């Protein structure tokens, strides 16, 4: 798995101990392992390999894109927070399915185009609101709509989970 990552991304990775799941008599299992670049322990992602297949699939590109989108949306979320009575934290989790997981690279200049595709990635947005004392829920709903609109204006298909 280390060789696969090194060849695909031209950098070194720390690969943890692999584990086999869902294997049994007559059932192909899936090998899974967590890995991260040597230069960044905060960028842990999953690699999988189905038994009896020669190819691997990983979520490194999805992890990089998730971190970038989280930073971008947190900036949008914080635009009106100075005038608000609450704090909001945004986190984005992108999951790439095949064939994107196999072909997309972190520095792809057309990330937004890839995310917009019908067969593109799963794009989940979590909004966590804190310090809600003396706050109107109507104001919070307006804030959620503002953040959601900034995403959908880019034609990105997503699901939003809100934690109050």
Identify the residue ranges that each predicted region occupies:
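Non-cytosolic head/periplasmic domains of membrane-anchored proteins
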Residues: 62-126
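Extracytoplasmic/periplasmic C-terminal soluble domains
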Residues: 106-164
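Exposed beta-strand-loop-beta-strand "reactive/processing" segments of non-cytosolic proteins
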Residues: 12-49
């Amino acid at each position: 798995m280390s060789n696969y990552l090194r060849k695909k991304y031209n950098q070194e990775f720390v690969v943890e101990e692999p584990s086999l799941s869902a294997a049994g008599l007559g059932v192909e299992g899936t090998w899974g392992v967590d890995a991260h670049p040597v230069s960044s322990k905060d960028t842990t992602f999953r690699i999988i390999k189905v038994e009896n297949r020669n190819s691997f699939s990983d979520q490194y590109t999805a992890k990089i894109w998730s971190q970038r989108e989280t930073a971008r949306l947190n900036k949008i979320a914080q635009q009106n927070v100075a005038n608000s009575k609450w704090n909001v934290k945004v986190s984005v989790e992108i999951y790439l399915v095949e064939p994107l997981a196999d072909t997309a690279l972190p520095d792809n200049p057309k990330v937004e185009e890839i995310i917009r595709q019908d067969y593109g990635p799963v794009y989940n947005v979590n909004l966590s609101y804190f310090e809600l004392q003396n706050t109107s829920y109507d104001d919070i709903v307006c804030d959620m709509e503002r953040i959601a609109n900034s995403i959908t204006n880019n034609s990105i298909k997503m699901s939003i989970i809100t934690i109050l």
